[in-house]
Regions:
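Conserved short loop/turn motifs at secondary-structure junctions
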Residues: 2-12, 27, 59-60, 85-93
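Non-catalytic beta-strand/loop surface segments
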Residues: 13-17, 21, 27-83, 103, ...
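Extended, regular secondary-structure scaffolds
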Residues: 74, 85, 93-113, 236, ...
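Short cationic amphipathic helices and targeting signals
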Residues: 84-91, 208-212, 320-323
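Helix N-cap motif at beta-to-alpha junctions
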Residues: 90-95, 215-217
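Long, charge-rich alpha-helical interaction segments
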Residues: 272-277, 282-289
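Extended, domain-scale alpha-helical bundle/helix-rich regions
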Residues: 287, 294-341
Length: 386
C-alpha cells in the first residue's frame, strides 16, 4: 500500500487530512538516515542521466503523485517474465524446473518483445560540485558531509572488477592504507565518510572518499586532501609489499566460502546477476583463476596500480564533489511542502468525496483488524513429501 488520505479524526470530515501508507511512511523513515540522504543525493548528481539517479524505494514526496494505474502499468512493463532471469543451483535437473516455470508462470503471460536495459551514464566533460541540505542531530549543527566520488568502469567485467577492488583495498583497506590514513589523520573532519569505498552493485562502479564533521566551505580542501594523497602515491610509488598483501587478502576474500548470512548457492547467483541483467556472460565473473592470473601478469609491469589510480581517479572527469549542509529547519520545510501538496490535492473535494475517504478508512481498519482464518493455510502431510 503506497499512500492514502485519512482524516486525523477518522469520523470527522472537518478534521485535518493526513497522508498515511506503509510505503510512504517506510520511505520517510528510511530517508531520515543521514547516510541514505548522502547516498541518494550523491547518486542523483553522479548518475544524472540514467536510472540510478532515482531512489529505488521511492522519494516520499514523489510517492504522493503516483496513482494505482501508474503502479500497475510500471509493474506490467518492468516485472514481466520476459524481463526476468531464472537461476537454478544444485544437483538437480534444470529441465524439470524449467518445465515447472513454463507451465506455472510463463504460460500465464503473453511474450513481450520490449527489451529493457540499463544504459551507461553519459560521461561528464568536467567535474561537478553539488550540495544539498539535511537535518542535523542535536550537537551536529555545524557538521557538513563532503564526499568526492568518481564513476568508473562496468562492474561485470571480472578483470576490471578485481583490479578496481585491488586499487580500493590498497587505498582504503585499513588505518595504515594511505588514503584512509590521510582521511583519519586530517583535521578537516571528524572521521571518514560512511560512503568511503567502492560500490560495485550497480552497472558502473563508483569509488568514493570523504569526511564527515567538516566545517562550512571546506569542500574544496577535502577534495585537495584526497587528490594530493593520490598524486603523491603516483609520483612516489606504492610499496610492493602493500600491493602483494592487498592482492593476497583479495584472493582470500574472493575464494572463501563464508556463507555471509546466506546459502552459498544464493551467493553464486547474486554474483552472476549483474552480468545476466546487463547481457554479459555470467560464467566469466566466476572465472577467478583466469582473472587473477591476468592481474598478476599486469602487476609485473612497472607502476601498474599507480596507472590505475591515474586513469580511474586523477584523469577521470566524471567526478563529483558533493556536500550535505546542515539545516535545522530542513525537516520542517519538507513537511511544509508535503502539507501544501496535500492541501492542493484536496482543496476541491466535495462532501461526498470526504465521506468516501471516511468509508474507505473504516473498511481498511476492519480488514486490518480481522482475524485470519487458519484454514486458509496450506497443509503438508507425510504423503506430500517425496
Amino acid at each position: 500500500e503506497g499512500h492514502r488520505l485519512e482524516f486525523k479524526d477518522k469520523k470527522n470530515i472537518k478534521s485535518e487530512l493526513e497522508i498515511k501508507g506503509v510505503v510512504f511512511n517506510e520511505m520517510k523513515g528510511a530517508m531520515s538516515s543521514i547516510t541514505s540522504q548522502l547516498w541518494h543525493g550523491m547518486s542523483r548528481h553522479l548518475y544524472s542521466s540514467s536510472t540510478y539517479k532515482h531512489n529505488s524505494g521511492g522519494d516520499p514526496e514523489e510517492i504522493l503523485d503516483i496513482t494505482h494505474n501508474d503502479l500497475v502499468n510500471f509493474h506490467k512493463k518492468h516485472y514481466h517474465p520476459s524481463n526476468a532471469t531464472f537461476f537454478t543451483f544444485g544437483k538437480i535437473d534444470p529441465t524439470e524446473i524449467q518445465e515447472f516455470i513454463k507451465t506455472n508462470v510463463l504460460s500465464c503471460f503473453e511474450p513481450s518483445s520490449e527489451k529493457l536495459g540499463v544504459q551507461n551514464e553519459d560521461r561528464l566533460s568536467s567535474p561537478k560540485i553539488k550540495s544539498d541540505f539535511y537535518n542535523p542531530l542535536p550537537g551536529d549543527e555545524d557538521n557538513h558531509h563532503v564526499v568526492i566520488s568518481w564513476l568508473l568502469n562496468e562492474s561485470h567485467n571480472p578483470v576490471e572488477l578485481l583490479e578496481t577492488y585491488l586499487m580500493s583495498n590498497i587505498l582504503l583497506d585499513n588505518s595504515a592504507s594511505p588514503l584512509r590514513k590521510a582521511l583519519e589523520s586530517s583535521s578537516l573532519g571528524k572521521s571518514p565518510s560512511p560512503l568511503t569505498g567502492l560500490e560495485a552493485d550497480q552497472k558502473e562502479l563508483v569509488f568514493a572518499a570523504g569526511l564527515e564533521g567538516v566545517s562550512a566551505n571546506k569542500h574544496q580542501e577535502v577534495e585537495n586532501l584526497i587528490v594530493d594523497c593520490l598524486k603523491k602515491l603516483i609520483s612516489e610509488g606504492i610499496p610492493k609489499e602493500l600491493v602483494d598483501s592487498s592482492l593476497h587478502q583479495l584472493e582470500i576474500r574472493q575464494r572463501e566460502i563464508t556463507g555471509s548470512g546466506m546459502p552459498f548457492g544464493l551467493q553464486i547467483m547474486l554474483t552472476c546477476l549483474p552480468a545476466c541483467i546487463h547481457n554479459d556472460d555470467p560464467l566469466n565473473i566466476l572465472d577467478l583463476d583466469n582473472a587473477f592470473n591476468i592481474i598478476k601478469e599486469r602487476l609485473e609491469q612497472d607502476n601498474y596500480i599507480e596507472s590505475l589510480i591515474e586513469k580511474n581517479l586523477i584523469n577521470n572527469n566524471h567526478k563529483l564533489n558533493y556536500s550535505l549542509i546542515p539545516d535545522t529547519n530542513f525537516n520542517k520545510k519538507n513537511d511544509d511542502r508535503i502539507y501544501e501538496k496535500i492541501r492542493n490535492k484536496t482543496k476541491n473535494l466535495t462532501e461526498d468525496d470526504k465521506n468516501k475517504i471516511i468509508d474507505l478508512a473504516q473498511a481498511l481498519e476492519t480488514r486490518q483488524e480481522a482475524i485470519d482464518d487458519p484454514e486458509a493455510l496450506p497443509k503438508v502431510t507425510k504423503e506430500d513429501i517425496p
